[in-house]
């Protein structure tokens, strides 16, 4: 079932900004936009400032949209650090809002963690939170107002903001925690104002996501000319840099762009330019800017300039992670278009290469890459041998419209109704990322993970699996207080859902979660059912998982033909 995303034109711009809910200075239909001081252009040249000079133009109660993804991808680090230092030393600006569509950071102190300071930030609307845990901590401690839009919806909301549309209608998120009949995307106790509402249009339910208008942008490129026209030749991807710049510019704000170098006016190839100069108000040049955290200035394989020789198959160590990836590959067909998510699911592409079938299908990443060898870890998406790279917003358009045949996503918790939680668990806010966008429309959804967590140890080999130390954490729980994937909605849409672990495989049917496969060497009662908070339905066609999954040799797996 295709999922549509319908922009609705605003009758009278400017927009009603979310900041209006919290600040008397924000843009509303009845008030004027915030007025920004900005350095003037001289003879058309874009002002070039230090990062410290640039952030002085950010006023109290402004709404900052930050570009970037994990591992330092497109992160304007100098601007972020300068803003953090300005607040530490001057206690200004105060009470700003943060919009961050993609999770940037290193799951520790980088990303937007430096600006996660009480008093500096009043509210945040993010697609993903966990890459910058300091901002998550402010939300967990009820020190800021905190919202989560699905990553794809959020980037499309920014596009709507650029077009002065007050919101978007979408089926994405129905039945999940962003549905206002549940939590409405609110992440803590102090966040009360609704940004998402339920709408019935011609007999169908949609979620209406209010547009939140940004008025300050931190973006990054590789090179710009003296008028601000920018190219991304050393970058991993584009993300939604253009959408962010357009949204801030059209809402009367100020766009700050960090680059590695500047060149003479009109010397950049026009097809390489991704940001037109008239959108840029300030340029900050950082000659030491690197493509990713802690690496060389640029890796030409990651930037797509060089092709890695992948003719030699690299063997992956046999462990529980590989077992899950191998079994997940069985759900792929020739010619399929898939998405792979971060976590244990990201081993799919590596296993396919080992089996020699990686060219029989196309894997995509929501941030824009299409094809290639998927990277793992904090810089997920920094692929090599990529076939194409789209703007992130366009990638999500494709996903929302039902373009995916299959997706591979990791899970944190699953309940007896097939619902999945990844956004908030163990008291920590991780955020949804693109999970809701992807799982809402993919024709087949394959969730990947271990049956338990927290110290799980296994021995894999000779065609079987042995549990040597059971995990302390139960992942298959009776019920979920918050839902990131709705089993009920998936069944209503006719989607095919699998849950693959190292020792068992489940599928979702109308009467609940069915156990359909169990690993050789595993006892159903002792190792599976007793480790779940509910009893799964033992399928009448219960099978043993293919012993080849648990051997060190290449399986010789051949993909079945697509429909």
Mark where each language-model region is.
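N-terminal mitochondrial targeting presequences
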Residues: 18, 22-35
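Conserved phosphate- and dinucleotide-binding cores of soluble alpha/beta proteins
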Residues: 32-56, 71-87, 99, 105-114, ...
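Glycine-rich phosphate/ribose-binding loops and adjacent secondary-structure elements
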Residues: 55, 94, 314-317, 326-329, ...
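Short glycine-rich or small-residue beta-strand-to-loop segments that form or flank ligand, phosphate
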Residues: 63-68, 97-100
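Glycine-rich adenosyl-nucleotide cofactor-binding module
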Residues: 302-328
